[in-house]
Amino acid sequence: MADWSLLPNDLLELIVGHLETSFEIVLFRSVCSSWRSVVPPQDQSRCLSIKTHDISFNAGFSFSGQPTDHPLFGSTLTKIPIYLVKFWTPFGDDYLLAEMREREGGEPMFLLSPLSSNRIIYGMGINKVLFNSLTSPIIPFGQYYEITYSEKQPIRYRYGLPCHLWDKLEWVEITERVEFLKLDSEDSRDFAVLFAGRMCNLVMYRSRNMSWTQVVEHPEKYAYQDLVAFKGKFYALDSSGRGRVFVVELSLEVMEIPSVRGSQQSSKENLVLSGEELLLVQRFTPEVRHYDEYLYTWFRVFRLDEEEGRESGFKLMTLTTE
């Protein structure tokens, strides 16, 4: 096994120059003492410095697909890193899959479970988990992107608010999941963002022209439920449960990949990146069972098949224990 402590300082300084956030510096310093001597501790850092991009809106643009007569403020694109944390307990080793977020208003930084729909916060109440970054391995596991913007919406019912004000509009901050694609350019700063907007639409942002563009509207009633960037293209999965996947080119051209034929409607399906392959995973769960549904749940996994650079369809994979 390589001895990482023997790396020369000039190489370590080169690595540090490519770190984007203060938390990456924490991970860098946790490797060994010689690495810690290259970078001082981040004692004065009050945040994680999660990487963000400021994105502007076109005049009259809205995510709903309808023209608007009021200006939209800019939005913020945020990269949310996910880590696998290994720590020790009296009962043995344990693992925590968590996403990292900025602290707010001087509050301590916190971890969120990316698998939890109710956004359980680790570090508060009964879910409190303490670990030492020098002794607990922290492994980068992945990342996703979200966009935060403000939009005018009808005022919802509020206690004590006169009823004649319920139909007024107010600015509401909204956060949505998006897919990010880094593009080849001389300065390595060009990127594209795909967002599954409302009314079954897709909208794309290009940093080169700094504007959002409406992608061709979905020809049917199903919305898009999953987006993935893969090999310089976007892939979108609709919510039909029938394995319908669409390729979205940067030119805004949309093409449907031959669907998974002969498939019954799945209860849930997702696009998954696995190394250099794109997988379609379908989950089938009986509708009438709840407490023991895991006993009757089964999956089908398909791999995207490519021929001469074009997508020919998804083929069923045979999974083994080897």
Curated annotation (Swiss-Prot):
It comes from the Eukaryota. Disulfide bonds: none annotated. Pfam families: Beta-prop_KIB1-4, F-box. Transmembrane segments: none annotated. Residues 2-50 form the F-box domain. Coiled coil: none annotated. This is F-box protein At2g16300. It comes from Arabidopsis thaliana (Mouse-ear cress).
